[in-house]
From Swiss-Prot:
Places the protein is found: Cell membrane
Keyword Transmembrane: yes
Highest taxon of the lineage: Bacteria
Catalytic reaction(s) noted: Na(+)(in) + 2 H(+)(out) = Na(+)(out) + 2 H(+)(in)
Name used for this protein in its record: Na(+)/H(+) antiporter NhaA 2
Organism of derivation: Mycolicibacterium gilvum (strain PYR-GCK) (Mycobacterium gilvum (strain PYR-GCK))
Membrane topology qualifier: Multi-pass membrane protein
Intrachain disulfide bonds: none
Similarity comment: family membership: Belongs to the NhaA Na(+)/H(+) (TC 2.A.33) antiporter family.
MF terms in GO: sodium:proton antiporter activity
Transmembrane segments: 34-54, 77-97, 115-135, 146-166, 176-196, 200-220, 290-310, 321-341, 359-379, 393-413
NCBIfam families to which the protein is assigned, alphabetical: NhaA
HAMAP family: NhaA
Coiled coil: none
Source lineage: Bacteria, Bacillati, Actinomycetota, Actinomycetes, Mycobacteriales
Length: 447
């Protein structure tokens, strides 16, 4: 009697990816670490100024109006609004580039690898939202509009925390954290477009498709000239802003329009820089430093400034249901949603955790995902209005919740730092000195 063939081995949960993907993630996180440090400095400066004797100067600067109305376009915005609507569009352009790259050439193109981060991101969004709703169910007066505030993850803040505590997070968890944050950003921009858009100007929205289509046509044909692409991008942003849809959506759509694959080079001609690496990667290399080093820190400076009012004011804010819902959503909801979803998915697929990891590692990583800063503050502004009393409670909740999540994550991850250092050494050994660590060669993951 013939023996029953054994089923093929299942890919373990949080298994190590390819060398090319690991190298790309490492480079992205290195840049985000620098941006995260600048972000923290900008947020700290805003908090100090907003709680100093010169606080009026900060709020006067934030509320200073610039712009005007030209050709029926309403572009008379405060500096805070310019940062939220304009500069964050650059951040979401990078998000769009990342998303397309992940779905076309990254881990998300493989359904078996994409299932876990997508499911974890959804779980990490649903549970914090439910906690916020439960806490604010009887608050009334539109409090539930902020349900999406504790659902976001700030990858720059998270990797800055990793840099500060000096831990070598294994490559599998680093890749998962970045992929989770990318999917998280997609869900966030979808929520903003669907739930925080009220009056839509159909004509302006239709007109926005024209410069967007021209931009897509240009980049598909390999056009790189800034004097062509920047005006088309600005026109798309202006018309999207006028349409009533949040202008940051324009950034994501522009990112989606950029091709990922390398373009064929005519015979006899050397490839352009973008053709050697792919247009999306070429754009990302140039736009990410602007996003991480300028756009996000400036937004954080104008968004994080809140007059706490001393210990009494802080205590009063923490007793408010909105603040409490945000803190609980970030600190408890995010890790519970991510870990629970991961456990359920691993049980359904009968996949075991990678041999080098433990579930406490997943808990620590999911606590990092509870650091919701940039997008959480943006959603708070949209939900309650910039400068409103509830917006002040949002800022305190996001800041305190993110710092608390970062602190817990640091404690959890530091307890495993010795194991992480061992894994890091294993992942960097290159005995044949060919530039590819041996663990990736044994897995035939050179590409």
């Amino acid at each position: 009697m013939a023996a029953t063939p054994l089923p093929p081995p299942r890919r373990p949960v949080f298994s190590r990816g390819s060398w090319a993907e690991t190298r790309r993630v490492t480079e992205i996180l290195r840049k985000e670490t620098v941006g995260g440090v600048i972000l923290l400095v900008a947020a700290a400066a805003a908090l100090i100024w907003a709680n100093s004797p010169w606080a009026e100067g900060y709020f006067a600067l934030r509320d200073l109006e610039l712009g005007g109305e030209w050709f029926g376009l309403h572009l008379n915005l405060t500096l805070g609004a310019w940062a939220a609507d304009g500069l964050l569009a650059i951040f979401f352009l990078v998000v769009g580039l990342e998303l397309k790259r992940e779905f076309v050439a990254g881990d998300l193109r493989d359904p078996s690898r994409a299932a876990l981060p997508i499911a974890a991101a959804v779980g990490g969004m649903v549970v914090p939202a439910l906690i916020f709703v439960l806490v604010n169910l009887n608050t009334g007066d539109g409090a539930l509009r902020g349900w999406a505030i504790p659902t976001a993850t700030d990858i720059a803040f998270a990797v800055a925390v990793l840099a500060v505590i000096g831990t070598h997070l294994p490559s599998a968890l680093r890749t998962f954290l970045l992929t989770l944050a990318v999917v998280d950003d997609l869900l966030a921009i979808t929520v903003i477009a669907v739930f925080y858009t009220e009056d839509i100007n159909g004509l302006a929205l239709a007109l926005a498709a024209v410069p967007l289509a021209l931009f897509a046509l240009c980049v598909q044909r390999g056009v790189q000239k800034w004097w062509v692409l920047v005006p088309l991008s600005v026109a798309t942003w202006v018309l999207m802003h006028e349409s009533g849809v949040h202008a940051t959506v324009a950034g994501v759509l522009l990112g989606f329009a950029v091709p990922v694959r390398r373009q064929a080079t005519p015979r006899g001609r050397g490839p352009a820089p973008s053709q050697r690496v792919g247009m999306a990667e070429y754009f990302e290399h140039r736009v990410r430093p602007v996003s991480a080093g300028i756009a996000i820190p400036v937004f954080a400076f104008f968004a994080a400034g809140v007059s706490i009012g001393g210990l009494d004011g802080f205590t009063r804010a923490l007793s408010d249901p909105i603040t409490l819902g945000i803190v609980l959503g970030l600190v408890l909801g995010k890790p519970i949603g991510i870990v629970l979803t991961t456990r359920v998915l691993s049980a359904v697929t009968r996949a075991n955790l990678d041999a080098s990891l433990r579930w406490v590692d997943v808990v620590g990583m999911s606590m990092l995902a509870g650091i919701g800063f940039t997008v959480s503050l943006l959603i708070g502004d949209l939900a309650y209005g910039l400068g409103s009393e509830r917006d002040e409670f949002v800022k305190i909740g996001v800041l305190f919740g993110s710092l608390l999540a970062a602190g817990v994550a640091a404690v959890v991850l530091l307890t495993r730092n010795r194991a992480y250092r061992r894994i890091y050494r294993e992942e960097t050994v290159d005995e044949d000195r060919d530039g590819v660590p041996d663990v990736y060669q044994t897995r035939q993951d050179r590409t």
